[in-house]
Regions:
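Short, positively charged
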Residues: 1-226
Length: 226
């Protein structure tokens, strides 16, 4: 009989934790800011905040003044389509997770997802204890681990069909076979965090007016193993 050749995807953490979903201008999310009519002076003051945690501090100031973040769109149409292919609500879910990661005191993806799940911005029916948000985030992580990248149209094809190898910093090798997908999903879900990339390089983290004079703010998505 024919024995299929199994392909494995490999991530090495030797020399530092590797990224799972890489930042770029293509991974920016745009929000409109409502709830408060910001003056030019306020906008300038917020944009000039230059602390070591300036993105978080700018967001805190926007919220202090009554500003509300309303997700508008992901900046890159291809990346947004890839997200929608995984789940039609994934862009909005990740947008909520992004805002939360810059508001609370954790960057841990599992903790952030659980927090957003508690707030339930999509009003899912939680009567039966179904984990809507966690399931969708896990699907995103699996897709990212197996070949989905931001600016390349993706059709749900996984680049590895056998499993996923993780080379840990101490040289140990973890092997996840796809026939135990839940174990693999949980590994990704429990071992990833969001990371703030360079705001000047990728053009996010400042208040600005769009072409219709609406006040906007961009946040950037990057996921790294922790």
């Amino acid at each position: 009989g024919m024995t299929p050749t199994l392909g494995f995807s490999i991530k090495s953490q030797i020399g530092g934790n590797s990224t799972l979903f890489n930042a770029g201008k293509t991974t920016n999310f745009t929000f409109t800011i409502t709830g408060h009519n910001f003056t030019d002076t306020e906008i300038e003051a917020i944009n000039s905040i230059d602390t070591s945690s300036k993105i978080r501090d700018r967001i805190r100031k926007i919220k202090e003044l009554g500003g509300v973040f309303c997700f508008k769109a992901m900046d890159d149409a291809i990346c947004q389509n890839n997200f929608i292919l995984i789940d039609s609500w994934l862009p909005l879910i990740m947008a909520n997770i992004l805002v939360e990661s810059n508001r609370g005191d954790t960057k841990d993806l599992k903790a952030l997802t659980e927090h957003v799940s508690t707030e339930n911005p999509l009003n899912y029916d939680t009567t039966y204890n179904q984990h809507f948000y966690a399931h969708k985030v896990k699907n995103f992580l699996v897709a990212t681990a197996l070949g989905m990248v931001p600016h390349t149209p993706w059709n749900g094809t996984y680049q590895a069909n056998g499993g996923y190898l993780v080379v840990k910093a101490d040289g140990d090798v973890l092997c996840y076979h796809f026939y135990d997908r839940n174990l693999f999903e949980d590994y990704l879900y429990c071992n990833t965090k969001l990371e703030t990339a360079s705001s000047s390089r990728y053009g996010f983290g400042k208040l600005y007016k769009d072409e219709t004079n609406r006040l906007c703010f961009k946040l950037n998505l990057q996921v790294r193993f922790k």
